Design a protein with these regions (language model features):
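STAS-typified acidic loop motif
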Residues: 2-43
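Amphipathic alpha-helical interaction surfaces in cytosolic regulatory modules
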Residues: 32-106
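Short, ordered loop/turn segments at secondary-structure junctions
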Residues: 89, 112-113
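Short acidic-hydrophobic, aromatic-tinged amphipathic segments that line or gate anion-handling sites
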Residues: 107-111
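A charged, well-structured terminal subsegment
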Residues: 113-121
């Protein structure tokens, strides 16, 4: 199986009623080779950004090294007071995220609108 290169697209989105949110849209495989794409893109987000959506709907494969990168990013976000909401995970990865404790740092949502609305809670 050939690994699909990780792509991360950063964009701004207006979420009603909370306002501007930064969205990181992941695509491809997230593995140890994804460090620059995942952490590099996250580090480009200003500390003043307080709401981040993570979109995993384009992710086909995520291994333990990739999960470690996501956890590292979420810990860094937590330290700067950034809130993260997550959506688009395939059911298998939802179970894995829950088992490894990622849900301490984020809530998993079924879709983008639900994740967006969670910032107002």
């Amino acid at each position: 199986m050939q690994e699909k290169m990780t792509q991360v697209k950063m964009e701004e989105k207006e979420c009603v009623p909370v306002g501007s949110v930064t969205v990181l849209r992941f695509a491809g495989d997230i593995t140890s080779a994804s460090k620059a794409a995942v952490l590099g893109t996250y580090q480009g987000i200003p500390d003043t950004t307080k709401r981040i959506l993570l979109d995993f709907s384009g992710v086909d494969y995520l291994n333990s090294s990739g999960i470690a990168l996501i956890i590292q990013m979420m810990i860094a976000a937590s330290k700067t007071g950034q809130r993260i909401q997550t959506f688009g995970l395939k059911p298998h990865f939802q179970k894995v995220f829950t088992m490894v404790g990622i849900t301490k740092y984020t809530t998993l949502h079924p879709d983008e609108n639900t994740a967006c609305a969670a910032f107002s809670a």
